[in-house]
């Protein structure tokens, strides 16, 4: 009967006393009276304590509500005393285990209070502007979409908690044999680690509306306390001892010691994530850092969607949201988790491509706003309508980066972050064939040995998921195997970094090539895929695909290079045999007035090491400049060779003799012109004599 009253008091505490009245109550001394107080329509509760009895009478109709029935259903009335005792003693009590820690922070904020700023509406979004800077209210634009009204926890927690009735959004992330459940509410968030037998649950925030069943008290589960929040840890003693002993000692203590605002949490997550990637933990069993990353992911979304009331510049809002989305992309890539989006409807209004310009976000034209908005829209899983002029901006973005770095200069961190967004856009596009093919072929061309050296040196200091990106991690460079990478790095005595590089490539590189119909069936093959506008070149060490093939003969026996050409919309047919074979012919003349060499590729390869690099050629002038001796691109080395891939599927060999002949022919043309001018000048003077 104690459980009934416990449940009743819980109902009262949730809904208030407004509609709940105890009609009759009395106290009497035992054996002093025999008066009967039973009445129809009332439930009588008698509580005996030594020589005193307390009697409560409550209307039966109060127990007809569904949620009341659910509360009573959550109580086990068949539990024996031994079971009850075992239930009490088996849980992990942070206070008795000396695991409780209390922190006092001085919270600060850079959020601008709402003042007498001017207002304007852009894309149905109310904005404020002051001194040409546009602001939005973070409490509005960061509202999370809560799609459920009751958050249901795993079965193991029914021993401790009554059902939680809160608006919430719940997501499940499957990782190997572990399920991470994240439930976000306006007051707190819950993250549980479920392995089938040994579950761990964290609850963080304002936990005043979470009710524990007797004899448990909330204070028994407090694991961390800050100025404004409590962190509850609910699990068994044996679970901590057998699987997660680190929870007794340390759990993100550096977070609680700081002002855990959004920017700090994002930076902490990125630092942990980059180390996690390089150390090869992705796809491995759950460890301490896995706990940290999943908790930080939930904590960041919780604080992002519930804390702060004031104004922030639109660009800062956009960049922060981009970082939040990137955290989710990391989980998808590293933990192989299925996409499970948390939706922010007001943020979608900011992702508007229909406006002429983005001056309300920033007047800095070097910031790739179109790429940012496309990344966010595609990451949300939405089908977006992007005008052609915006796609052109994105295309110009990747072309500008390529033009700057095609002759092997080091990429800056902002440029790497930009390329990360472009790569994600290229991986996510279903339609827009032209732009996604352009993105992938230029990324593939930006990957060369020098970029690999620069990137490897940078990995020691990288602390950000986006700036950690290299174009060598594009989905179409599956030819970069452990052996190839080790060979490249060994030339600079960097082969000790091979594992770090391969760990990073395996996370960033999209596994499937389903965005390209003609090569989707060979996603697992070790090959390079070069996506020109209407055809795709595949370079591999064996026959893998039905198409027109070219075999490179100027390599040693141990090195094989097979080039296969497939049309844009052809059906992907894997094969181990020759399908249609052509010979590679030398090219004798590279001059053209019809842009024959536009949108082509120059491929450098070595007799022993195989493919070295690709260079995308936008027009004939670029090709002439590339093979000019002054650019030092052409290496006069008997082991090094060059091929020219044209956009029509033709493959030619560029030889040193051809280059010299081309240069000589140009000199001869100039010489002929000079001779003709001299002859004409002489004829002119002869005619003047008559």
Curated annotation (Swiss-Prot):
Q: How does it sit in the membrane?
A: Single-pass type I membrane protein
- This protein's record includes keyword Coiled coil: no
Cellular component (GO) terms are:
host cell endosome membrane; host cell plasma membrane; membrane; viral envelope; virion membrane
Q: List the residue ranges of the region (Interaction with gL).
A: 174-234
Q: Could you tell me the keywords of this UniProt record? A: Fusion of virus membrane with host cell membrane, Fusion of virus membrane with host membrane, Glycoprotein, Host cell membrane, Host endosome, Host membrane, Membrane, Sialic acid, Signal, Transmembrane, Transmembrane helix, Viral envelope protein, Viral penetration into host cytoplasm, Virion, Virus entry into host cell
Q: Does the keyword Transmembrane helix apply?
A: yes
What task does this protein carry out? Answer: The heterodimer glycoprotein H-glycoprotein L is required for the fusion of viral and plasma membranes leading to virus entry into the host cell. Following initial binding to host receptor, membrane fusion is mediated by the fusion machinery composed of gB and the heterodimer gH/gL. May also be involved in the fusion between the virion envelope and the outer nuclear membrane during virion morphogenesis.
Processing after translation: N-glycosylated, O-glycosylated, and sialylated.
Q: Name one Pfam family in it.
A: Herpes_glycop_H
All ranges on the Virion surface side of the membrane = 17-667
Family named by the database record: Belongs to the herpesviridae glycoprotein H family.
What ranges are annotated Intravirion (topological domains)? 689-690
Recite the lineage of the species: Viruses, Duplodnaviria, Heunggongvirae, Peploviricota, Herviviricetes
Residues carrying covalently attached carbohydrate according to the record: 24, 34, 51, 137, 206, 410, 534, 569, 589, 648
Annotated InterPro entries: Herpes_gH, Herpes_glycoH_C, Herpes_glycoH_C_sf
What is the name listed in the Swiss-Prot or TrEMBL entry for this protein? Envelope glycoprotein H
Q: Cellular location of this protein?
A: Virion membrane; Host cell membrane; Host endosome membrane
Q: Which GO terms describe its biological process?
A: fusion of virus membrane with host plasma membrane; symbiont entry into host cell
Signal peptide stretch: 1-16
- Assembly with partners or alone: Interacts with glycoprotein L (gL); this interaction is necessary for the correct processing and cell surface expression of gH. The heterodimer gH/gL seems to interact with gB trimers during fusion. Interacts with glycoprotein O (gO).
Report the Gene3D superfamilies cross-referenced here.
Herpesvirus glycoprotein H, C-terminal domain
């Amino acid at each position: 009967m104690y459980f009934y009253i416990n449940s009743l008091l819980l109902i009262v505490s949730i809904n208030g006393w407004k509609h709940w009245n105890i009609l009759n109550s009395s106290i009497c001394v035992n054996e002093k009276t025999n008066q009967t107080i039973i009445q129809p329509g009332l439930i009588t509760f008698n509580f005996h304590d030594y020589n005193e009895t307390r009697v409560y009478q409550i209307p039966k109709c109060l127990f007809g509500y569904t949620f009341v029935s659910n509360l009573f259903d959550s109580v086990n009335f068949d539990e024996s005393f031994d079971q009850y005792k075992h239930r009490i003693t088996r849980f992990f009590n942070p206070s008795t285990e000396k695991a409780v820690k209390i922190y006092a922070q001085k919270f600060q904020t850079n959020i601008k209070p709402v003042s007498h700023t001017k207002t304007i509406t852009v894309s149905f979004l109310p904005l404020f502007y002051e001194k040409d800077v546009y602001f939005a209210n973070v409490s509005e634009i960061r509202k999370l979409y809560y799609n459920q009204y009751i958050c249901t926890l795993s079965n193991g927690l029914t021993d401790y908690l009554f059902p939680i009735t809160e608006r919430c959004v719940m997501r499940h992330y499957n990782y190997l044999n572990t399920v991470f459940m994240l439930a976000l509410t306006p007051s707190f968030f819950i993250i549980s680690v479920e392995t089938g037998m040994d579950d761990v649950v964290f609850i963080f925030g304002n936990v005043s509306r979470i009710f524990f069943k007797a004899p448990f008290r909330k204070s028994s589960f407090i694991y961390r306390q800050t100025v404004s929040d409590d962190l509850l840890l609910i699990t068994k003693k044996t679970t901590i001892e057998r699987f997660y002993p680190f929870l007794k000692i340390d759990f993100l203590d550096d977070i609680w010691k700081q002002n855990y605002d959004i920017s700090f949490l994002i930076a902490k997550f990125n630092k942990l994530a980059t180390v996690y990637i390089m150390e090869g933990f992705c796809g491995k069993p759950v460890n301490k850092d896995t706990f940290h990353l999943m908790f930080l992911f939930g904590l960041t979304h919780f604080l992002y969607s519930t804390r702060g009331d004031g104004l922030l510049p639109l660009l800062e809002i956009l960049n922060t949201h981009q970082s939040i989305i990137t955290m989710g992309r990391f989980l998808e890539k590293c933990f192989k988790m299925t996409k499970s989006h948390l939706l922010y409807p007001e943020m979608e209004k900011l992702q508007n491509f229909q406006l002429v310009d983005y001056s309300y976000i920033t007047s800095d034209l070097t910031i790739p706003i179109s790429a940012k908005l496309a990344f966010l829209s595609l990451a949300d899983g939405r089908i977006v309508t992007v005008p052609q002029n915006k796609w052109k901006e994105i295309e110009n973005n990747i072309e500008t980066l390529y033009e700057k770095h095609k002759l092997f200069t080091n990429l800056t961190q902002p440029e790497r972050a930009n390329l990360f967004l472009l790569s994600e856009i290229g991986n996510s596009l279903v339609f827009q064939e032209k732009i996604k093919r352009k993105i992938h072929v230029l990324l593939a061309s930006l990957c060369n040995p020098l970029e690999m050296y620069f990137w490897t040196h940078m990995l020691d200091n990288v602390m950000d998921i986006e700036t950690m990106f290299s174009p060598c991690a594009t989905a179409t460079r599956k030819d970069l195997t452990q052996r190839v990478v080790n060979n490249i790095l060994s030339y600079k005595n960097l082969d000790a970094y091979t594992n770090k590089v391969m760990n990073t490539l395996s996370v960033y590189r999209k596994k499937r090539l389903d965005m390209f119909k003609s090569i989707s069936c060979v996603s697992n093959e070790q090959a390079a895929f070069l996506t020109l506008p209407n055809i795709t070149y595949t370079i591999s060490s064996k026959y893998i695909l039905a198409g027109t093939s070219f075999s490179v003969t100027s390599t040693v026996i141990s090195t094989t290079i097979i080039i296969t050409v497939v049309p844009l919309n052809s059906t992907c047919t894997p094969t181990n045999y020759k399908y249609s074979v052509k010979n590679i012919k030398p090219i004798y003349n590279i001059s053209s007035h019809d842009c024959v060499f536009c949108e082509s590729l120059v491929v450098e390869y070595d007799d022993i090491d195989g493919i070295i690099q690709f260079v995308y050629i936008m027009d004939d002038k670029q090709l002439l400049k590339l093979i000019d001796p002054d650019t030092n691109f052409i290496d006069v080395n008997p082991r090094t060779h060059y091929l020219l891939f044209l956009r029509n599927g033709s493959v030619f060999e560029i030889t040193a003799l051809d280059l010299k002949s081309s240069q000589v022919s140009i000199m001869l043309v100039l010489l002929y012109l000079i001779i003709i001018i001299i002859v004409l000048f002489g004829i002119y003077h002869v005619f003047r004599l008559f």
